[in-house]
Amino acid sequence: MTVRRVNVVILVLLVVAFLIVLHRNLLNLNDFLNQETSDTVPGMILPFETDFLLGRKAMRSGEEIPVLITAPEERLGAAVTAMNSIYRNSKANVVFNIVTLNESVVHLSTWLSKTDLKHKIIVFDPSILLGKIPTDAQKMETVRPLTFARFYMPAFLPDAEKAIYLDDDVIVQGDIRELFNTSLKSGHVAAFSEDCDSASSKGIVRGAGNQNSYIGYLDFKKEAIKKLGMRANTCSFNPGVFVANLTEWKQQNVTSQLEFWMERNAKEDLYSKTLADCMTTPPMLIVFYKHHSNIDPMWNVRHLGATGAGNRYSAQFVKAAKLLHWNGHYKPWGRTSSFSDIWDKWYIPDPTGKFHPIRKHVEEK
């Protein structure tokens, strides 16, 4: 064989080897992309917004503290204000994972571009809820799709081992690192604040039934609930603020358990009629029945959105609270809420002018 033929053979072999390597790499890339897609269902994660903006303050270093919060269009101001209160009261490296709907991405991005908040925007796909919530028109009016985002925390935070979930109607006055460091017992997925604790019991709403026990959320006359063997007078907990061990969450298939009870309720109407508009608490009460840890009650001082909340809490107590929660009808960006001056302290005006808090003195001008 001549030298020329040998060179040709070697060249052909090199080309074949290159094509084999290229083919394998393409297969690996395809597998990677498929895995990424499955990890982020039912939403997609958009890239960091503030990390790449020039002229910003130096980003905080150290252990990341993931915080998941939702931001529906009509309440974007609530989410931004809550996040700002967290950022300003801590030096921790907090990453805000904001779940919103597709139509709110531009508005939210514009607003956040005026802040120093380190964040990711996650677009939630409401179709994931098909068959999991009642189709009754009257009930559907009170259902907000984003309220179920907390059920999918591991999908939105695939790399996090531990994270915090917060409702948007909160203000944080303490260092969020303290809440993040809440100790969870072995085998426990999450830590909540119970409704019977000394702080929240001051704000129990009169006339709202048994709002601090399981019977206020579940219909114990239904056979499916009876079979669970739960005690109706068991103290309930508030799922608007919690710390989650996401590794344990995935191992125990918590999302699947929550979806199971959502589907059962859609077919059998298992939730209590007392709080018909509360769709997220009942399945969580079932899944975490006597199997959760507790957070410090001062990290969820709630019922500030209830009638007469201003008479239930002293100014000194509210000032000492680590986290204020306006769960209830009256929100701090509305006209008749208690302690709205505290919320105003952390409010960042909407650069688009679409959102603004309602205030009496403004209306009277």
From Swiss-Prot:
Q: Which Pfam families match?
A: Glyco_transf_8
The principal localisation class reads membrane
User: Which SUPFAM superfamilies does this entry report, sorted A to Z?
Assistant: Nucleotide-diphospho-sugar transferases
Q: Which residues lie on this side of the membrane: Cytoplasmic?
A: 1-4
Quote the subcellular location field of this record: Membrane
Q: Give the CC-aspect GO terms.
A: Golgi apparatus; membrane
Arranged from A to Z, the UniProt key words for this protein are: Glycoprotein, Glycosyltransferase, Membrane, Signal-anchor, Transferase, Transmembrane, Transmembrane helix
**What's this protein's family per the entry?**
Belongs to the glycosyltransferase 8 family.
What is the protein name for this chain?
Glycosyltransferase 8 domain-containing protein 1
Source organism: Danio rerio (Zebrafish)
